[in-house]
């Protein structure tokens, strides 16, 4: 490898990974609540281990949701349907411990600082403050048609395919837990040129040989997903490199909501503010502002204003206006970063209620994002993935 070239690696996990089970349960509960009460406040955390699910958090709503039923349906859909897996939708225990949102937090969200001080009327959308302080990042680049970094894009596609061949019984001996990882080589111009390494670990039936798993996964998972032009004779494959992966899922490792935040976003290619997404309604800026930051970054790249763009937003609890907006185009910008911030402020309402309105976030759309990434999802119609602002941004930034 030339000294001016570099390697970058990202990973993904399947929907049967213990942490991802938790993300999907938390977002399933959120969606069930939002179907009946779009204004509910939800912060739902899930933990799983052998034979046990614990759902906890703060939920303020006018509706009733059968949480154990929602939990079991989600686990069944993922594929944990047999007691010998050590975790089974029918027989696992489901414990719940739910409180209401703290009134101190609710006060800040219900009516933003600016509205409480009389600067805005109660009727305006600015009357919702941020549910917490924090910083969030959004990113986009032109490496793929979905404007995502190539390593995480391929890792997600491999994980999705791993689940497809299991559920469609193309490889019926597979079990739900699995992980993928892709290492991409970049040239001196930071363009992806080849795949250096592919790693796949998949849970399986105990009677299947490692050789069969390796052969089947190359044929049915890797070859249909990975572009042939990026593979060469030096590409390395590590398929179940420990040799055996029978005990998996919550029996193998305990899982928690919010422990796959890099898988959920950009695979480490961009910075992360630390806040998780799943189980949180849109008044939580950890989620909604991260979606908005992606929306901004993607439209900047789609407009041709940069090849690569990272957007940072930051908030104070109870305050509607972001305390800061920062944009980094890594030397690829066609306009100055000051100009980009100016046109972003003009074209995007980045106050929490503005984000909710702009992206229509009070809908039950979250469970589908809880596995295989929240961004770059060509299989879903997610509002923060639209590029409907690109033309206006280009016009405002370049005067075209």
From Swiss-Prot:
Cofactor: Mg(2+); K(+)
Residues that hold ATP according to the record: 17, 177-179, 244-245, 253, 259-260, 276, 280
Alphabetical list of SUPFAM superfamilies matching this protein: S-adenosylmethionine synthetase
UniProt pathway: Amino-acid biosynthesis; S-adenosyl-L-methionine biosynthesis; S-adenosyl-L-methionine from L-methionine: step 1/1
InterPro entries reported for this sequence: ADOMET_SYNTHASE_CS, S-AdoMet_synt_C, S-AdoMet_synt_central, S-AdoMet_synt_N, S-AdoMet_synthetase, S-AdoMet_synthetase_sfam
Subcellular location per the Swiss-Prot or TrEMBL entry: Cytoplasm
The protein's Enzyme Commission number: 2.5.1.6
Binding site for L-methionine: 58, 101, 253, 284
ATP-binding is among the record's keywords: yes
Database matches in PANTHER family: S-ADENOSYLMETHIONINE SYNTHETASE
Summary of the function given for this chain in its UniProt record: Catalyzes the formation of S-adenosylmethionine (AdoMet) from methionine and ATP. The overall synthetic reaction is composed of two sequential steps, AdoMet formation and the subsequent tripolyphosphate hydrolysis which occurs prior to release of AdoMet from the enzyme.
Protein name according to UniProt: S-adenosylmethionine synthase
């Amino acid at each position: 490898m030339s000294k001016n070239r570099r390697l970058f690696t990202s990973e993904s996990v399947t929907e049967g990974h213990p942490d991802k089970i938790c993300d999907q349960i938390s977002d399933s509960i959120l969606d069930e609540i939002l179907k009946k009460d779009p204004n509910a406040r939800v912060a739902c955390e899930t933990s799983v281990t052998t034979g046990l699910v614990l759902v906890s958090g703060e939920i303020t709503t006018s509706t009733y949701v059968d949480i154990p039923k929602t939990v079991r349906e989600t686990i069944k859909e993922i594929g944990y349907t047999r007691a010998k897996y050590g975790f089974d939708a029918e027989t696992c225990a489901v414990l719940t411990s739910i409180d209401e949102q703290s009134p101190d937090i609710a006060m800040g969200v219900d009516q933003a600082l600016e509205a409480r001080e009389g600067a805005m009327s109660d009727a305006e959308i600015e009357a919702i403050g941020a549910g917490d302080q924090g910083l969030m990042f959004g990113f986009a680049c032109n490496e793929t048609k979905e404007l995502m970094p190539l390593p995480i894009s391929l890792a997600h596609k491999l994980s999705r395919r791993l689940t497809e061949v299991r559920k469609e019984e193309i490889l019926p001996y597979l079990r739900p837990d699995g992980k993928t990882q892709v290492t991409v080589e970049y040239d001196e111009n930071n363009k992806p040129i080849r795949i250096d390494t592919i790693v796949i670990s998949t849970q399986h039936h105990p009677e299947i040989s490692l050789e069969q798993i390796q052969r089947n996964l190359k044929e049915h998972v890797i070859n249909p997903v990975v572009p042939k032009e990026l593979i060469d004779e030096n590409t390395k494959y590590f398929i179940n490199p420990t040799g055996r992966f029978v005990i998996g899922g919550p029996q193998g490792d305990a899982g928690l909501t919010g422990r796959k935040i890099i898988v959920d976003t950009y695979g480490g290619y961009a910075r992360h503010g630390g806040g998780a997404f799943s189980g949180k309604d849109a008044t939580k800026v950890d989620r909604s502002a991260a979606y908005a930051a992606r929306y901004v970054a993607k439209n900047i790249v789609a407009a041709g204003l940069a090849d690569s763009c990272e957007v940072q937003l930051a908030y104070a609890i109870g305050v509607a206006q972001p305390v800061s907006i920062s944009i980094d185009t890594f030397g690829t910008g066609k306009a100055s970063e000051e100009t980009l911030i100016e046109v972003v402020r003009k074209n995007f309402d980045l106050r929490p209620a503005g984000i909710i309105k702009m992206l229509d976030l009070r809908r039950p759309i979250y469970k589908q994002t809880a596995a295989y990434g929240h961004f770059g999802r060509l299989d879903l119609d997610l509002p923060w993935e639209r590029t409907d602002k690109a033309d206006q941004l280009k016009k405002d930034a370049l005067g075209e």
